[in-house]
């Protein structure tokens, strides 16, 4: 399955034209990470390559990746597609795609300590995936395995953007209107006010360039709206952002109950709080959908109403389904890292590759560096 790439691979030639063909963005994918690896990961990656016109570097056990590609070429794969969410068979002509396979002899498991694991397993799939971006072989990476390993590998392998103390995870959450960004989503449990100020700057760039929000509004997640509310971190962060209110389009404190009411576009908090928000949101959304479905099945009237409401339920599911967002960008490192949910299947991986491609094309790291300078 390895073959000569169709497009130029020089890192210095990104965005140039060879002959009459423009360079194709290459995304490195950790094929061995996640609960459904490698088949669902490979399937989502090739699906994205076919739909979004990207080249791929699939990193992992070469024989298993090749087996996946062969099955996909011959049989396709089942996946929910489009707004209806109905599962259908997806067909992809794998042979027509620009795919490079990099063999990785090791895998970092979910329970391993990230820092120790990446030092011990230098030939692991996530380490080699990061190395592909670090050396310029690929433009961005997608990983659905250990979040800690993906973050640690990216931090040590790619390095931090100058002026950024710590990278942060940008989490996209749905609201009644447009999506919002919660940052940090879990990279840093202990933060300083200066770090949260940097998160605000990075979150604004993400919101503007990836989500298309003009002049994103920033808020500090807190237990009350007043300036003196919250712990020392929240109060000092409030002061820093208030001092540069126009630059950050700072709206003040945001309470948890206001999170999904579009009072701001970027919500800053430490990674401990942000990750709890993410997990509670996922759990609540899942619970509500299950409760509604259960009520629809409770009696004949419920079944009738449920049948009539099915199109509306599908649209709601689409808005709150994590698979639609694909993955979370790790902002602040010298490279594009998209971290997907460990439960991700093909559709989520396809969208994660799309997020990676958009981040490359919008030059998000360059804009972060310029904003911090």
Regions found by a protein language model. Give the residues of each.
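Compositionally biased, intrinsically disordered low-complexity segments enriched in Pro/Arg/Gln/His
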Residues: 3-6, 11-14
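Short Gly/Ser/Thr- and charged-rich N-terminal loops/segments
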Residues: 14, 82-90
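N-terminal phosphate-binding or glycine-rich loops at protein starts, especially the Walker A/P-loop
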Residues: 19-67
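Short, glycine-rich nucleotide/cofactor-binding loops
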Residues: 27-39, 118, 187-197, 339-346
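Short glycine/serine/threonine-rich phosphate/pyrophosphate-binding segments
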Residues: 37-41, 122-136, 140-154, 161, ...
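Glycine-rich phosphate/diphosphate-binding loop of Rossmann-like nucleotide-binding domains
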Residues: 39-40, 55-57, 189-256, 270
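Phosphate/nucleotide-donor binding subsite
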Residues: 75, 90-138
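Glycine-rich phosphate/nucleotide-binding loop
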Residues: 155-168, 172-182, 263-267, 271-373
């Amino acid at each position: 399955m390895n073959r000569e790439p169709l497009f130029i691979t020089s890192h210095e030639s990104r965005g140039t034209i060879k002959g009459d063909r423009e360079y194709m963005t290459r995304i490195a994918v950790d094929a061995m990470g996640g609960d459904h690896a490698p088949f669902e990961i490979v399937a989502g990656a090739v699906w994205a390559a076919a739909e979004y016109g990207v080249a791929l570097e699939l990193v992992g056990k070469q024989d298993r990746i090749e087996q996946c590609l062969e099955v996909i070429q011959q049989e396709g794969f089942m996946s929910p597609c489009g707004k209806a969410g109905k599962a259908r068979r997806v067909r992809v002509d794998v042979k027509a795609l620009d795919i490079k396979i990099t063999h990785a002899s090791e895998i970092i498991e979910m329970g391993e300590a990230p820092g120790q694991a990446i030092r011990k397993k230098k030939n692991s799939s996530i380490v080699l995936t990061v190395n592909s971006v670090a050396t310029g072989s690929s433009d961005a990476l997608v990983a659905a395995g250990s979040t800690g390993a993906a973050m640690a590998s990216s931090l040590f392998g790619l390095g931090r953007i100058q002026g950024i103390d710590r990278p942060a995870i940008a989490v996209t959450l749905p609201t009644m209107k447009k999506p919002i960004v919660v940052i940090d989503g879990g990279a840093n449990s202990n933060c300083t006010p200066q770090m949260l100020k940097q998160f605000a700057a990075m979150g604004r760039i993400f919101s503007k360039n990836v989500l298309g929000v003009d002049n994103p509004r920033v808020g500090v997640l807190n237990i009350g709206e007043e300036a003196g509310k919250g712990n020392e971190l929240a109060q000092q962060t409030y002061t820093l952002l208030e001092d540069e209110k126009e630059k950050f389009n700072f709206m003040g404190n945001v309470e948890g109950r206001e999170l999904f009411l579009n009072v701001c576009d970027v919500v800053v908090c430490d990674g401990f709080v942000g990750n709890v928000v993410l997990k509670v949101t996922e759990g609540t959304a899942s619970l509500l959908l299950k409760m509604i479905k259960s009520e629809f099945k409770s009696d004949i009237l419920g079944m009738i109403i449920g049948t009539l409401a099915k199109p509306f339920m599908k649209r709601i599911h689409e808005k709150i389904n994590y698979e639609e967002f694909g993955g979370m960008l790790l902002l602040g490192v010298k490279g594009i890292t998209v971290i997907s949910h460990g439960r991700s299947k093909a559709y989520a991986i396809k969208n994660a590759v799309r997020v990676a491609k958009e981040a490359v094309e919008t030059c998000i790291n360059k804009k972060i560096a310029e904003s911090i300078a």
